[in-house]
A protein has these predicted regions:
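Sec-dependent bacterial lipoprotein signal peptides
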Residues: 1-18
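Cystatin/cathelin-like cysteine-protease inhibitor module
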Residues: 20-188
Length: 188
């Protein structure tokens, strides 16, 4: 009986020792790497909750809306400066209209390339709480928001949910390169 009890205790201790080995959380690892950005420090994730997801189709619609709104604004400004006979200002807005038009065409090209993946998830939105320590600097993330691709690439980190989708186009493959080619700046 004493031997059986010792065997059970030993089995329980072994189970606890091997069962307590915790696998690293890939989300925590990716978010921590983004927050630390290569600096020496630690990141502890206290809580995480997925709050939304966005498909490529929805993200393309958002980006198209952003560029169409910018085109409308530039067109109004161009017309206004032309009427006021201010050719330098009008020329600047004409150039902005041309860049925006190129960005819209580039977005259409990217959409064509991704046609078969439009209904796939581009990124997920999360609300989380955590803490990073870099040197002596401690940063608390209480109710912070993050957008992450299914491949665990962080594309946005912010304190306000309304700011979360400003970088959403970054989830579209080729989007940043297209912006660089057109010289267009992204605005939300």
């Amino acid at each position: 009986m004493k031997t059986l009890r010792n065997v059970l205790i030993l089995s329980l201790l072994c189970t606890l020792a091997f069962g307590c080995k915790q696998e690293p959380d890939p989300f925590r690892e990716a978010l921590g790497a983004y927050i630390l950005r290569g600096q020496t420090g630690t990141f502890d994730l206290f809580s995480i909750q997925k709050i939304d997801s966005t498909t490529f189709r929805t993200e393309f619609e958002r980006r198209e809306h952003v560029f169409q709104r910018k085109m409308e604004e530039e067109t109004v400004l161009y017309g206004s400066y032309t009427m006021q006979r201010m050719p330098k200002n009008a020329a600047r807005h004409w150039e902005a209209m041309q860049r925006t038009e190129q960005a819209i065409k580039g977005l259409d090209s990217l959409r064509t390339v991704l046609e078969g993946r439009l209904d796939e998830i581009a990124y997920y939105d999360y609300v989380f709480s955590g803490q990073s320590v870099i040197g002596e600097e401690v940063t608390n993330y209480l109710g912070a928001f993050a957008s992450m691709t299914p491949e665990l690439e962080v594309i946005a980190l912010c304190s306000e949910r309304r700011d979360l989708h400003k970088s959403g186009g970054h989830a579209i493959p080729g989007y940043l390169q297209m912006l660089r080619r057109t010289g267009e700046e992204e605005e939300e």
